[in-house]
Amino acid sequence: MKVLCEDVNGPRSSLGRAWSHMSWLYYQYLLVTALYMLEPWERTVFNSMLVSIVGMALYTGYIFMPQHILAILHYFEIVQ
């Protein structure tokens, strides 16, 4: 089992490189947002709030943007 884990997470396998890249991106996220200074439970609360706010913004944009775009196109008489 240990050999299998080393092969998957090794630096030469594509899965290992992808994992290393995702780890590096997560580390950059922690540094840029200064989350590395928070305790784990505080980090979880912050990330939960961030995911919920982004999710609500995406959902709202998906539901309401087509109506607004169509209204703008009707206003400028691009669409009859």
UniProtKB/Swiss-Prot annotation:
<feature type="site" description="Within the serine palmitoyltransferase (SPT) complex, defines the length of the acyl chain-binding pocket, determining the acyl-CoA substrate preference">
    <location>
        <position position="37"/>
    </location>
</feature>
<comment type="similarity">
    <text>Belongs to the SPTSS family. SPTSSA subfamily.</text>
</comment>
<feature type="topological domain" description="Cytoplasmic">
    <location>
        <begin position="67"/>
        <end position="80"/>
    </location>
</feature>
<dbReference type="GO" id="GO:0017059">
    <property type="term" value="C:serine palmitoyltransferase complex"/>
</dbReference>
<comment type="function">
    <text>Component of the serine palmitoyltransferase multisubunit enzyme (SPT) that catalyzes the initial and rate-limiting step in sphingolipid biosynthesis by condensing L-serine and activated acyl-CoA (most commonly palmitoyl-CoA) to form long-chain bases. The SPT complex is composed of SPTLC1, SPTLC2 or SPTLC3 and SPTSSA or SPTSSB. Within this complex, the heterodimer consisting of SPTLC1 and SPTLC2/SPTLC3 forms the catalytic core. Within the SPT complex, SPTSSA stimulates the catalytic activity and plays a role in substrate specificity, which depends upon the overall complex composition.</text>
</comment>
<dbReference type="InterPro" id="IPR051900">
    <property type="entry name" value="SPT_small_subunit"/>
</dbReference>
<comment type="pathway">
    <text>Lipid metabolism; sphingolipid metabolism.</text>
</comment>
<dbReference type="GO" id="GO:0005789">
    <property type="term" value="C:endoplasmic reticulum membrane"/>
</dbReference>
<comment type="subunit">
    <text>Component of the serine palmitoyltransferase (SPT) complex, which is composed of SPTLC1, SPTLC2 or SPTLC3 and SPTSSA or SPTSSB. The heterodimer consisting of SPTLC1 and SPTLC2/SPTLC3 forms the catalytic core of the enzyme, while SPTSSA or SPTSSB subunits determine substrate specificity. SPT also interacts with ORMDL proteins, especially ORMDL3, which negatively regulate SPT activity in the presence of ceramides.</text>
</comment>
<feature type="transmembrane region" description="Helical">
    <location>
        <begin position="44"/>
        <end position="66"/>
    </location>
</feature>
<keyword id="KW-1133">Transmembrane helix</keyword>
<feature type="topological domain" description="Cytoplasmic">
    <location>
        <begin position="1"/>
        <end position="21"/>
    </location>
</feature>
<keyword id="KW-0812">Transmembrane</keyword>
<protein>
    <recommendedName>
        <fullName>Serine palmitoyltransferase small subunit A-A</fullName>
    </recommendedName>
</protein>
<keyword id="KW-0746">Sphingolipid metabolism</keyword>
<dbReference type="InterPro" id="IPR024512">
    <property type="entry name" value="Ser_palmitoyltrfase_ssu-like"/>
</dbReference>
<dbReference type="Pfam" id="PF11779">
    <property type="entry name" value="SPT_ssu-like"/>
</dbReference>
<keyword id="KW-0472">Membrane</keyword>
<keyword id="KW-0256">Endoplasmic reticulum</keyword>
<dbReference type="GO" id="GO:0004758">
    <property type="term" value="F:serine C-palmitoyltransferase activity"/>
</dbReference>
<keyword id="KW-0443">Lipid metabolism</keyword>
<feature type="topological domain" description="Lumenal">
    <location>
        <begin position="39"/>
        <end position="43"/>
    </location>
</feature>
<feature type="transmembrane region" description="Helical">
    <location>
        <begin position="22"/>
        <end position="38"/>
    </location>
</feature>
<dbReference type="GO" id="GO:0046513">
    <property type="term" value="P:ceramide biosynthetic process"/>
</dbReference>
